[in-house]
Amino acid sequence: MSKDLIARYRNAGFEAVADGAMAFFDRRTDLQRAGVAFGPGGGVEPAKVSTDISLVAIDRSDPDAFGLSEVILRGVAAGLERYVHERPLFRSVCPDQELFVMPIFNLQRYAPGEGFKQWHCDWTISDEATEPVHRVLAWIL
């Protein structure tokens, strides 16, 4: 049983998911947008500088994006299962026993010199499908 909060998992399956996401990002320039971070604002430079593609995992209108979303969700679900197996307390502290609710996520690319420029959060605290105020775990792939 691990007591570390942060875990790193690596295997050929996860690497294939990452390669697929990178290829999708390069191929789908039509979906790329300037990254957005929510914060106090008013600064000279934005909280982050990136190029993002937002995906909605339940949206079947774009078969290419939906297919990638499905692969990413399966990969994250496998990582989550391993994570909570190593940390069983997570299963007991989540009241609804639902640890994976995330139909919306971003692919973010940072070119040299880009990235986080100031304190920020990626989501507001408004009522959104991602329920950010109730987030227990976040994934960076």
Question: Residues of each region from the PLM?
Answer:
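Fe(II)/2-oxoglutarate oxygenase catalytic core
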Residues: 1-141
